[in-house]
Structures are given as C-alpha cells and as structure tokens.
Amino acid sequence: MEGLNNAAMLGSNMIIIVNDNDQSIAENHGGLYKGLKELRDTNGESPDNIFKAMGLEYYYLGDGHDVSALIKLFTSVKDIDRAVVLHIHTIKGKGLKYAEENKEYWHAGGPFHIEDGSPKGPGWPVNETVRESV
C-alpha cells in the first residue's frame, strides 16, 4: 500500500496492473476485497475508489480475456506522464471447465493433462498434499 500511496507523487509513467480474478486461496473477506467487488459491480464507476483516493488515475476493464480490449487499453496509457491503475477483471482458469468449477484446487498446481486436468508425473506439489491432509 505504501508503494501505491507514493506512486501518484512520482510524476512518472507507471502502469500498475491489478489482475482481479475475484480469488484468494480461500473465501474472500475484508475491505480491499469489498472495494474491488464494488468496482467490478459498477464497471469501475463506484465513487468509493481506493486508487483514485490515492491520487492515481484509474481504468477498469471488465473482460481481461479480450485481447483486443487489452491492447487498446495498454496503448491508450503507454505514454501517459503519471501513474495509472489498470484494474483488469479475469476469470481464474478461463476456458478450462474443470479449473473454472474448482478454483481453489487450481489456484496453484503442477503440470497436468489439458484434456482432463489429471496431474502429470508423481503428483501435485507439497502445498496440495498439505492442504488435502488438513
């Protein structure tokens, strides 16, 4: 937060990307989550905008999987002379049904077979093994 707080004062071309996939390792709680959700729900138009409150310019993109829209957004800010936040909404596991339906399981993992999501090799990394054993 300190970096964001000072970014507006630098007067430099800084592009800050917030990849908002509405996800943490478990259920989301807290003020930052609520603020990002409100921005998503209002297509970035909420008057309660933590980034604007810090003096940062703010842009919202509701479909972070639209490559043309991403290129247009980045092109529009690449030469700007101040710090900007690009709040880009994405879907964790987009395009892989098994990943979209089980986001927590797919939050991190190892190599897998794209056809069915089964792991390649001996198994998942230690973090998966620990999570399942708890």
List each model region and its residues:
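Glycine-rich ThDP/TPP pyrophosphate-binding loop and its adjacent helix/strand module
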Residues: 1-133
